[in-house]
Amino acid sequence: MNEKYAALKSNVRMLGHLLGNTIRDAHGEEIFEKVETIRKLSKSAQAGNQADRESLIEEIKHLPDEQLTPVTRAFNQFLNLTNIAEQYHTISRHCEEHICEPDAINSLFSKLVQNDVSKLDTAQAVRDLNIELVLTAHPTEITRRTMINKLVKINECLSKLELSDLSSKERKKTERRLEQLIAQSWHSDVIRQQRPTPLDEAKWGFAVVENSLWEAVPDFLREMNDRLKSYLGEGLPIDARPVHFSSWMGGDRDGNPFVTHSVTREVLLLSRWKAADLYLNDINELISELSMTVSNDQVRELAGEDQHEPYRAILKQLRALLNETKDILDAKIHGQKLAVKAPLQKVEQLWDPLYACYQSLHECGMGVIADGSLLDTLRRVKAFGVHLVRLDIRQESTRHADVLSELTRYLGIGDYEQWSEQDKIAFLTNELASKRPLLPRDWEPSEPVKEVLDTCKIIALQPREAFGAYVISMARTASDVLAVHLLLQEAGCPYRMDVCPLFETLDDLNNAESVIKQLMSIDLYRGFIQNHQMVMIGYSDSAKDAGVMSAGWAQYHAMESLVKVAEDEGVELTLFHGRGGTVGRGGAPAHAALLSQPPKSLKGGLRVTEQGEMIRFKLGLPDVAVNSFNLYASAILEANLLPPPEPKQEWRDLMEVLSEVSCEAYRGVVRGEPDFVPYFRQATPELELGKLPLGSRPAKRNPNGGVESLRAIPWIFSWSQNRLVLPAWLGAGEAIQYSVDKGHQALLEEMCREWPFFSTRLGMLEMVYTKCNMEISRYYDQRLVEPQLQPLGDRLREQLQRDIKSVLNVENNENLMQSDPWGQESIRLRNIYVEPLNMLQAELLYRTRQTEEASANLEEALMVTIAGIAAGMRNTG
């Protein structure tokens, strides 16, 4: 085992050694020795040495306040560096085959050959390939932009050091650079001092595009093209756009009062400015490259007859267009009222002249030049357009109903919110069909209502290409969808936007089918949507509401019934997945998660949210992003060309039982245990999390309520901090054991072998169990929970132990994650640093809760532990 990851371990050692030097220089020998003692005790405790575990606890209990911050920061940085080394390892030349999946696409092709899938079908599936990743801000992306840029540079150094023919002079220079970067990170703020604004979040998203995706997209398409050529004999069409991006940053106003219509307008301007800026870099590079003099007639005509270097002449025209666009957008961003529009409005303004150059170079025998940087730029133009990313708008359904309520009361026709669903639909369809405006000129709406209407006006003023979808959270009825169409129409929106209901609680998921059926029965609505409907499936709220097993089945069921409705109605359906990084929020390794969906659910392509810290792990470096695109592409092609089996009726029946039993078990604790909420508040840093300057949105929808008013993210985040990770497993193992006791062992084993949906669920549970740590959870209880609440923690841990046995028994496995040695190793590697952070966090919570006003020192150290554990647990919220 040890030899297996030798290259990775030697990088971890080297980075750790350099960090040690930095700590010694910054804080002296005493702190360095303290950190080393704790690290060694932790390593020995991990190996099962109980005496050293006790010593570790004592060591941390006796740390003076002023040493807590540097010690905590040391372990936080160790973890960040371990994560970098691990992320780098997956793309390094020393990477073991079973980790890198060197080639998801090629292994898919050999599967297709084995299953006699025709090349014609494959070519069609490739043409239909549509992956839309929706970048969302995330309070758990604790890593600041400054740090992320340093991480990218550290990666570059690791890559250099791997070259075997590096001279000793170059090696020294690179090692010195690494040491500087690690020192820079150490002396920067790990944690933001202020909450980020929605604009900061949007800029963070643009930085991901600039640092990674801008390179990754053409690289991915180039690789894909070569593979298709060798397998199918034809490559990707030049205008193919299998991967593109949308964003919620600056558009998601659900529960976030800071995202206003003016913020949305500014983000749209910034997004276009950034796109123009990135294209300008490309064009400048092409100007230096394309100095050729021979061209076809079309290029000569575009360049003007007397041009000696026609390609450069065309590119210089584009450069002027982009510079002018940037200047005008810049002035608008800085508040100048300009009547002129930025000249770059449509993708064709870039595509047509560049494509003309491309064709001319090919015609004149210079194809090898055309297929270089010019082709990359053309591919970017298709993927990123003039807006860089399309913006989604998200708002809660009740906010739209409030607008209509206030309006109908003003018009004297009653109170919209009190009407029956039938009356609402009649009113909305009537108004949608009507030519006269509905909003009276002299009406002065209240502030919240005006804000919703102003947002609709911003949408109406922008081109269709600027937006992805209008997502309605907590959508429950057909009128919720029609209401948004009406408000957009009233704002003068000249096109029909994709209005996408988000079904997120257990009941809403179960009703999704009937809502969409009802919409499809309205002729007017059918006319609007031009045979295309998008529906979003919420993962986090359903899991918080009913537990993971029950939520997982409800999501599967909802997808399956929506696919059927769409087929019956002859409508194209796009399912939009609101997954998070954690299992409690639907996270699973991408490839497995997609293959475990119902048959035909990926026909309309994939649209999925990528969140905060997962953006960094999956898309943060160009090579890593290319790997992620390959995994997504191969999974979608496989799901569409080799669909998973339809579940047998007896599997479904048993899933119904599992779902019911697990939901009861979960709610029995979360809602039924009178001590549960006080225990949760004492055993986790939930209350302290609210103070963290993490995301731009508040942690609670309603500041006074219990668990149900907590947002899904802090709910899950808090439990992953104390290592009980309760929401990701509670109820599931009990339901499995219940079914075994009822004599269904053989059927469960069959489901495990033959049904990807079920085996993925169990695989996700195994990963969660591996990340749970009962001893640490018990230590939090001893240090933080009052004695009369401690028995509840003991009961939960006993349940967890029983659940692990039940799941391993059904899978016929001896140990957790035995089929995923790399996953195991990766968790083990980080645990050495996570455990001390957990101990430190429990100590810090204990100390801050002892005083009315905790010192800034302790608060900062506490925030660093929260950030560090989040980095160590990888999928936090």
UniProtKB/Swiss-Prot annotation:
Entry keywords, A to Z: Carbon dioxide fixation, Lyase, Magnesium
Q: Name one GO cellular component term.
A: cytosol
As cofactor, the record names: Mg(2+)
Q: What is its EC number?
A: 4.1.1.31
Q: Which domain of life is it from?
A: Bacteria
* GO MF entry, a single one: phosphoenolpyruvate carboxylase activity
Reaction equations catalysed: oxaloacetate + phosphate = phosphoenolpyruvate + hydrogencarbonate
The answer, when asked if Acyltransferase is one of the entry's keywords, is: no
The UniProt entry annotates the active site at 138, 544
Q: What class of enzyme is it?
A: lyase
- Name a biological process GO annotation: oxaloacetate metabolic process
Q: Which PANTHER family match?
A: PHOSPHOENOLPYRUVATE CARBOXYLASE
Instruction: Give a short account of what the protein does.
Output: Forms oxaloacetate, a four-carbon dicarboxylic acid source for the tricarboxylic acid cycle.
Q: Which family does it belong to?
A: Belongs to the PEPCase type 1 family.
The name on file for this protein is Phosphoenolpyruvate carboxylase
